[in-house]
Amino acid sequence: KTEQKKEFQTFEEFKDAKLGVLTGSEYDRLTKELFPDSEKFQFADVANLILSLDADKIDGFLLDSAYYSAVGWEREGYKSIQSDNTTVSYAFMLSESGMAKKVKGELDEFITDMKSNGGIETLAEKWLSGRKPTEFEDYSTLSGENGILTVAVSNSDMPLSFVSEDIARGFDVEIMIAFAKEYGYKLNFAPVDFEAKLGGI
């Protein structure tokens, strides 16, 4: 957050700062590794991290570029300090029961195809470019001839998955919608808090 009282310019200046951490995330490990002497505060989601930053309860927090691209959707006055020293990987997690093995194979194939045909880049431009999208994919009319997939989504992890007006939206959500269209599934999105995702699976 940019303010008159203190403006951090480098990673090193955060070494003894008050830092927010997304509970159970890779940022927890990275914060401990990069800033072992900092004071750390746990938060359930990115929205509460930002609110605490606004209230001066924390000085900052680690966030990947995907999440940061949505910070400016509703608010202004923030800055980021870029670092190429760390990377965070993403994946879709499936349970080991039911038709998960079949779905995993299909999803792996579909994402590989999206990477080669430009589908991922199109969604990235829509969701990760810093501009708030105004048009969304409709998943209410999916055919479902091959079954129904229940998909856990975060309530407020913009721009990847979040719920707005009782509708699931986001980069991850639209990947799943495109997948369901291609393979004949219907989607039941189940909003959960971040820490409840694994339990739901």
Task: Go through the PLM ranges and name each one.
Residues 18-21, 61, 93, 149-154, ...:
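Short, well-ordered beta-strand segments
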Residues 30-33, 47-87, 196-199:
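A ligand-binding cleft/hinge motif common to bilobed small-molecule-binding domains
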Residues 39-42, 46, 51, 122, ...:
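Extracytoplasmic small-molecule ligand-binding "clamshell" domains
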